[in-house]
A protein has these predicted regions:
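Preference for extracellular/luminal or secreted protein segments
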Residues: 2-5, 13-73, 284, 293-294, ...
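N-terminal small/glycine-rich loop or linker at the start of catalytic domains
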Residues: 44-58, 118-137, 180-182, 217-235, ...
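Acidic/histidine-rich, surface-exposed loop or edge segments in extracytoplasmic proteins
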Residues: 50-58, 78-85, 185-187
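Second-shell residues forming the walls of enzyme active-site clefts
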Residues: 67, 83, 92-105, 111, ...
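Catalytic domains of carbohydrate-active enzymes, especially glycoside hydrolases
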Residues: 72-86, 162-167
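Glycine-rich, aromatic-flanked loop segments that form ligand/cofactor-binding clefts
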Residues: 104-132, 152-176, 198-222
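A charged helix-plus-loop insertion that forms the helical arch/lid used to bind
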Residues: 131-144, 188-192
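Alpha-helical scaffold segments that flank or form the walls of functional sites
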Residues: 144-165, 246, 323-324
Length: 394
């Protein structure tokens, strides 16, 4: 075990063993928190803050579809921070462009319009609708230099931006330490088993997108590459297969200031969570102590889809929301894939509002997440490319 991870474990054990944070005057601080909560509730800001923590999928591919109309209303009311596209939402490139234009037109705050466009097997926009596809990460790393990959990824980012997307939920920086991994290695979703090579290609991906005003998200923290199971379908425990070298791409990219968002994985890693049954996405030790305190990540932490079976088969909806936020997630994704629920934003708001009214620590978490998300959106606004390039047809 490296000295670096050993230091993390020592710090985490110390912090997690404290029953309450040390304060100079806990009574006075409690009064201040209660006053802040009262003001937030009175002026309606609590609901608005929670809205910036919820990113949802929707059913429909035209402005006339009920699912689209619903998210437009939620965006207008400030109940969501953004949307995520799946294949079901894409009928044509022009239709997507108009959907995104409508969403931003009515939103009270700029929306994150997200998509998984990694390349290879994982891309929602395909050649079938005239979108120029890109190779998988594995193929890119085998056939191109990082400089050549940068050109490919700049074209990708430009195409996404022209359609109204401002967040690509990629790159995958998991190490390909298990080529038989059903959700990473077998699908060609990893650049390499070499941390330095992964970092080089991921940096090319990130910088290319940033140049075109598109945010990116490193995934899947703290590492999904060694798993033997798919967390979409249930528990994926990497405790015995994971090693701390899987943190290196995250650590080095964060240290260089190149990371906007980190996506939390639903894998179980007892080496980091100090529990045999807590997924990384619900683990304070993993997301707050390791990622925030030890690795000094200052950006936005976003969950993987909270409706994946690794979560839904093992934790109630209410508990998953509460635990995810307290663990350190700033945004929760609900892709609404297999069992769409248009009421998700309202349900999340009810759960978090009630908890915040009785738990000052939850209020602090909501406020911190809101600040993180709004800082991200301000950065997006200052970086958005003014290009009007039409997406190149296949």
């Amino acid at each position: 075990m490296s000295r670096w991870i050993a230091t993390f474990i020592a710090v985490a054990c110390t912090l997690l063993g404290i029953s309450a944070p040390l304060r100079a005057d806990p009574v006075a601080e409690t009064h201040v928190r209660k006053a802040n909560l009262s003001r937030a509730v009175e002026d309606g800001r609590l609901r608005q803050m929670i809205g910036q923590m919820v990113l949802v999928g929707f059913v429909g591919d035209s402005p006339d579809d009920d699912g689209y109309k619903r998210v437009v209303k939620q965006a207008e009311a400030g109940e969501i921070t953004g949307v995520i596209y799946l294949g079901r939402n894409i009928s044509s490139l022009e239709a997507v462009r108009q959907l995104n234009k409508g969403l931003q037109q009515y939103a009270t705050a700029p929306l994150l319009v997200a998509i998984d466009q990694e390349g290879g097997r994982i891309q929602r926009l395909t050649g079938e609708v005239g979108f120029k596809e890109v190779p998988s990460e594995a193929t890119v790393a085998k056939t191109m230099s990082p400089e050549e990959a940068s050109v490919v990824y700049q074209d990708l980012a430009s195409d996404l931006s022209s359609l109204g997307f401002n967040l690509n939920l990629a790159p995958v920086v998991d190490l390909n330490v298990n080529p038989s991994n059903p959700i990473i290695g077998k699908l060609g979703r990893s650049f390499s088993a070499d941390p330095q090579k992964v970092e080089a290609y991921a940096r090319a991906f990130i910088e290319a997108h940033r140049a075109k005003g598109v945010l990116t998200a490193l995934k899947h923290f703290p590492g999904h590459g060694s798993s033997t199971k798919d967390s979409h379908k249930g528990i994926a425990d990497v405790t015995k297969t994971w090693s701390d070298k899987e943190l290196l791409p995250f650590k080095d990219l964060i240290a260089s200031g190149d990371v906007d968002i980190v996506m939390a994985a639903h894998v179980i890693n007892a080496k980091l969570a100090f529990s045999p049954d807590i997924p990384a996405s619900l683990s304070r030790a993993t997301l707050t102590v390791l990622l925030r305190d030890n690795m000094h990540f200052k950006g936005v932490v976003i969950s993987d889809d909270m409706q994946m079976q690794a979560i839904t088969d093992n934790v109630s909806f209410e508990d998953s929301v509460l635990r995810a936020v307290m663990a350190g997630n700033d945004i929760l994704i609900f892709a609404n894939d297999k069992h769409p629920d248009p009421e998700i934003p309202e349900k999340v708001a009810a759960i978090l509002s009630e908890e915040a009214r009785r738990n000052p620590e939850m209020l602090d978490r909501i406020k911190t997440s809101y600040e993180n998300v709004m800082h991200l959106k301000r950065k997006l606004g200052s970086a958005v490319s003014q290009e009007t390039t039409v997406v190149r047809e296949r």
